[in-house]
Amino acid sequence: MIRAKKHFGQNFLQDEAVLNKIIQAIPKDTQNIVEIGPGLGDLTFKILQICSVTAYEIDSELFALLGKKFAKEVQNGRLKLFCKDALEKWDEGGVSEQGYFLVANLPYYVATKMILSAIDDEKCRGLVVMIQREVALKFSAKSGESEFSSLAILANLQGSCELLFDVSAQCFNPPPKVVSSVIKIQKSKILLGESGIFKDKFEYEKFKIFLKIAFASPRKTLMKNLSAKFDKFELNTLFAELNLSPAIRPHELNVELYLKIFENLKEDNERQKRRKSGSLAGQEQ
């Protein structure tokens, strides 16, 4: 009998009703799924009924068990099974060579990092994952809610994020000490490129830095947070143009407004650079 290992954050989901609800949340046109931490293979078994699976299991003991349990699927290519850390695969270039949908019961200690990696991965079409409820609320929060943060903006940037349902600790073996929730992110927009939200990865990374500044102190006003890095006069002008109160707080804006503020500050910065380079050229003459 295989026991859950604490250092891998293992809690095996074995409730039939919950497993079925996760399957029902997967888009009907999905052809390729990536599963992280398949564990004993209960969810894997159900996913294989609808499409092919690429699974990453870091535990060598479970990897061997899964290889035996799904020997037929591995042999015919319906299941690609790797004994590897999925985060390392993302760092190396990606968890799949083709477009995919992520479905997983994620280990709590790396859930946020894995979701952000999937959000950044242009091959990922979306995800249905189970995580700690506290983290789920941060990703699925709506503008105006106190939990609304940079995580919610990134989760909704390319589409939508919603909390589907909560899962009792009794649905797992062993039962975790927290309540879990299943969230769904469905991407509908292109992230990078000419028709994308950002022209390239460099600009996207700058946007993420901008969000860190904006939410540096959530209880302070957005103006106060941004003025630590940007010109106060330009911020006042921009807020007036967008009809934003100087007293507005970071969680009270929506994704579109954050994109507008970022775009305007980027254009102001580029204008300043052009003016500086022009004045330097004049001095040299």
UniProtKB/Swiss-Prot annotation:
One of its GO terms (molecular function) is RNA binding. It holds the Pfam family RrnaAD. S-adenosyl-L-methionine binds at residues 11, 13, 37, 57, 85, 105. Its main location: cytoplasm. The keyword RNA-binding applies. It catalyses: adenosine(1518)/adenosine(1519) in 16S rRNA + 4 S-adenosyl-L-methionine = N(6)-dimethyladenosine(1518)/N(6)-dimethyladenosine(1519) in 16S rRNA + 4 S-adenosyl-L-homocysteine + 4 H(+). Keywords: Cytoplasm, Methyltransferase, RNA-binding, rRNA processing, S-adenosyl-L-methionine, Transferase. GO terms for cellular component: cytosol. Coiled coil: none annotated. It is found in: Cytoplasm. It comes from the Bacteria. Its EC number is 2.1.1.182. SUPFAM superfamilies: S-adenosyl-L-methionine-dependent methyltransferases. Belongs to the class I-like SAM-binding methyltransferase superfamily. rRNA adenine N(6)-methyltransferase family. RsmA subfamily. Specifically dimethylates two adjacent adenosines (A1518 and A1519) in the loop of a conserved hairpin near the 3'-end of 16S rRNA in the 30S particle. May play a critical role in biogenesis of 30S subunits. This is Ribosomal RNA small subunit methyltransferase A. The lineage of its organism: Bacteria, Pseudomonadati, Campylobacterota, Epsilonproteobacteria, Campylobacterales.
